[in-house]
Amino acid sequence: MHTIGHFVGGSQVAGRSGRTTPVFNPATGEQSAEVALASAEEVGAAVAAARAAFPAWAATPPLRRARILNKFLRLLEERIDELAAVITAEHGKVLSDAKGEIQRGMEVVEFATGAPQLLKGEITENVGTRVDSHSLRQPLGVVAGITPFNFPAMVPMWMFPVALACGNCFVLKPSERDPSAALVMAEWLKEAGLPDGVFTVVQGDKEAVDALL
């Protein structure tokens, strides 16, 4: 039985906790795989890898970050059928619905490619006597998204494209019931040029969620 693992440091890695849960094909009711459930220690290691990648990613010019997201968007456009099939096999929605959710997520990716224009700071002169006001837009660091079963591609794409465009590193904890779409997107982000550690996928249940929170 195939075991679905995590995506840490730019590559897929096997779980070490020894805990798994089955993944079913809703069309047949048969088990298609099992997914590793991360321990709190594994979550901590994944977050540490993301933190290590953060300084270089935050220092990457916004335009370069946007170029990577633009390449990712093109991969989504070219391979939408592939990702839709992965979603259908684990979630059970029909292919047309799966493509629809991907397309809605792609709209956010497209928006994020315009982030360089939105990341400009502001300077206001003479707000007071000999006082100027300066504002800077800077990344926060490592951020996380915990996403539900019903939209395994769209809801993550509501989160990570903007976070990445703004210079943050992102840790995604997808539903353990349909975990594979997250890994597909992680591989395509890497193919688009995203540096290792900037995007992480941790599979898991309540223990992983509690560790992230």
Predicted segments with their positions:
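Terminal low-complexity tails and localization/encapsulation signals of metabolic enzymes
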Residues: M1-E34, R67, K71, G121-T147
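Short glycine- and Lys/Arg-enriched binding-loop motifs that mark or flank ligand-binding interfaces
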Residues: H6, A14, N25, T88, ...
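Histidine- and aromatic-rich ligand-binding microenvironments
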Residues: F7-V8, P22-N25, Q31, V35-A45, ...
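Alpha-helix N-cap/helix-start motif
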Residues: R16, V43, I80, A98, ...
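Proline- and acidic/polar-enriched loop/turn elements at helix boundaries
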Residues: G18, P62, T88, K99-G100, ...
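Glycine-rich loop-to-alpha-helix module at the N-terminal edge of alpha/beta enzyme cores
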Residues: E30-L119, R130
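Rossmann-like NAD(P) dinucleotide-binding subdomain of oxidoreductase/dehydrogenase enzymes
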Residues: G121-L213
